[in-house]
Amino acid sequence: MGCLHSKTANLPSSDDPSAPNKPESVNGDQVDQEIQNFKEFELNELRKATNGFSPSCIVSEGGEKAPNVVYRGKLEGNHLVAIKRFSRQSWPDAQQFVVEATGVGKLRNKRIVSLIGCCAEGDERLLVAEYMPNDTLSKHLFHWEKQPLPWDMRVRIADYIAEALDYCNIENRKIYHDLNAYRILFDEEGDPRLSTFGLMKNSRDGKSYSTNLAYTPPEFLRTGRVIPESVIFSYGTILLDLLSGKHIPPSHALDIIRGKNALLLMDSSLEGQYANDDATKLVDLASKCLQSEAKDRPDTKFLLSAVAPLQKQEEVASHVLMGLPKNTVILPTMLSPLGKACAKMDLATFHDILLKTGYRDEEGAENELSFQEWTQQVQEMLNTKKFGDIAFRDKDFKNSIEYYSKLVGMMPVPSATVFARRAFSYLMTDQQELALRDAMQAQVCIPEWPTAFYLQALALSKLGMETDAQDMLNDGAAYDAKRQNSWRC
């Protein structure tokens, strides 16, 4: 078959100074290469970017039923963006919407997500912001999969969001609507940033808080109005989230604090990661922020002075603290179904997709007619392939290996699909080295075939080579994106 080559052989070491420190793309699409100047977009441009505002592009909570929906979009030049689509009645005055958006769009700071455009065409009111590829604080704090957020990262989040609020305060943007864990996003380096969408309030519906009323500032419940001190109260609820790792109503938290049981608030997964004195200081700050009287709450400068000294590992990058890969970050939401199955090590789903795909990925390749020729000329070859496919379908991987191995020796032209199926069969029988070899052979047959890279990622992960596995996953995702004639959300 000739010399086998896998990109794992040329992977840079994590200690290699030549290895890139800053991710530059997600699935081959550009993320945050340069912050664009604020502009007014054409509706058709944003419709195209979201595949016609396809439901599959929605990344916000609540899906289509939410009053304001956020989509993932891709502009010309493969720049990923987040597009917020307001309900038709939210901003009846188009000029007011554009003026407000333009004002917010002037804000530029490393602690906030930049608003780069808007659209007010017909009944549509849309905002366009930088795309943050590493999900929300809510996801990392309440719905984590691999590891809970460590203490040092939680302190950093508290510090960076305090910086963001202080910057907005300096720029006379003192009102932030519905500050919660969904409004804190993570960029390509894993740094937390404050969404600028919260700086724009729906002008008609007056709803500044969409979360449970138990978490809203007391003055909002009394008057329906938001004041600068309301933002400090909401920051206090963020501190509670970070301390406890769960949603705790402020009134309940204050009862615990007044009872001198502050450490009972702490997330049990953080045990041994913090000094009690540091935790007590954060709890005390949360208590100050959650005072029922707005005048008793601290300002943003006080937040900074209280939180900044608690950072102990400022020299450690956020992606390291969070356990994110150092190289290109690939989000599950940006992967194809096969890529998602690979990322989750979901072998059952991976098997199902291989079955459904069949041999279609070899169409157009040099060997596309090989099976057709075999079925016409060699009945034994046809039967061997048939029995191998049946065994693979029935998850009889021992026999699928036997039949596919026999078929490999009979094929006049190598088949990437046969190697892929045998590779998966080897994986399912704990023969990872053989699985990796076959996945590499599949790559030789079709050099830019995502399936071959995903199989290598699975095998490398099983072998404990996580860095190399992540690299293969990234490559597979990039080739997945490249293979699309038009972007699918």
Curated annotation (Swiss-Prot):
Instruction: Name the reaction it catalyses.
Output: L-seryl-[protein] + ATP = O-phospho-L-seryl-[protein] + ADP + H(+); L-threonyl-[protein] + ATP = O-phospho-L-threonyl-[protein] + ADP + H(+)
A GO biological process held by the record: brassinosteroid mediated signaling pathway
**Composition bias, Polar residues:** 7-16
Report the top EC class in one word: transferase
Q: Where does ATP bind?
A: G62, G63, E64, K65, A66, P67, N68, V69, V70, K84
Give me the residues lipidated as N-myristoyl glycine. Answer: G2
- Listed Pfam families: Pkinase
- Enzyme Commission numbers on file: 2.7.11.1
Q: Which Gene3D superfamilies match?
A: Phosphorylase Kinase, domain 1 (3.30.200.20), Tetratricopeptide repeat domain (1.25.40.10), Transferase(Phosphotransferase) domain 1 (1.10.510.10)
Name one molecular function that GO assigns to this entry.
protein serine kinase activity
- Spell out the catalytic residues: D178
Where found, per UniProt? Cell membrane
- Name the segments for region: Disordered: 1-30
What does it do? Answer: Probable serine/threonine kinase that acts as a positive regulator of brassinosteroid (BR) signaling downstream of the receptor kinase BRI1. Mediates signal transduction from BRI1 by functioning as substrate of BRI1.
UniProt lists the family membership as follows: Belongs to the protein kinase superfamily. Ser/Thr protein kinase family.
Q: What is this protein called?
A: Serine/threonine-protein kinase BSK2
Name of the gene this protein is made from: BSK2
